């Protein structure tokens, strides 16, 4: 293999009077290396930074206020008290990342036609960007969180780990409208629920919010549902929902998930459903992260609903590109992520997502020299903290 990648005609030349006969011409080659690879670190650039992790498994606590209830006291009354408040713990793991390479001593010394002249500096910059992509991939794609186990490295749960469907199986008694969950539901009278089912009970709507009233006999697993908050709090019979059939595979959806089950593309109604779920819980999402393909769909949905009434003639054409929409629950902006697939959209409140560094990215120093080449390694470790996933929503299993 040739040491020099430029093959020159060493002559003798026919003459040096004309370019077609002369030799010794210099190359016109730019010193700048053009790289069209896109920037893919969407979340790494936008998520906040929490306090550094001090353990390979880190945890945090969440809570929410109890629903409102009727609170009217006599002028003269005795004080009563009860247990109050509930906390929920969440956790994630630190994932370690590294990239390495090597370059020969000769390759570092030979003159280059591009910058930087030292090949190590060029390659270090390259692998640093590549590792940033690997980190972004973990945030974007990791569906599990796990500790290191033998030869299996630890993985940090990414956005899909936090934004996934979580359900409790339940059964419906049609006579009294009592719903029984398969495990303790940890809800209070006045909380709202969403249902999913293979066969939806007659009189129940998927994606509709219902307010619950705990059953006196077994409040940990039984409740009734109502159309209004007041109906649930005050037990108004006229507001109770009593489906006429039990349906099949009925579950309560605990997270803000709109599941299209691969049957259809998403619509503006689906975005509004997700936003409504978050709104009811107190979140304030501002961006919807999606693939470029689904961003085109977003633009078409918005422009299709736009009315042009400026007396446009039939032979005139108006092209619009929409990136944001004002909904009943606030302004939402569509953002494309180069790593996103077509099957999901994440509607995020960016105030509740943080990167927790355990080991910030650095070059490993002091590596022993093994031969006529130089090895280099960069490494780092972090975990993702989805502080409050209920402040965000996701549309899943979108049909392409």
Predicted segments with their positions:
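Small/polar beta-strand repeat architecture
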Residues: 167-261, 300
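Sequence/fold signature of self-assembling virion shell proteins
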Residues: 2-38, 152-169, 253-269, 273-276, ...
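A structural detector for beta-sheet-dominated domains
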Residues: 61, 104, 173, 180-182, ...
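Acidic Ser/Thr/Pro-rich low-complexity disordered segments
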Residues: 71-87, 228-244, 312-317
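Assembly/oligomerization interface modules of large self-assembling protein complexes
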Residues: 24-104, 124-125, 147-148, 152-154
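Alpha-helical scaffold segments that mediate packing/assembly in large oligomeric complexes
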Residues: 109-178, 205, 245-273
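Glycine-centered loop/turn motifs
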Residues: 68-80, 190, 207, 342-345
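Internal mixed-charge
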Residues: 88-108, 117-137, 279-305, 323, ...
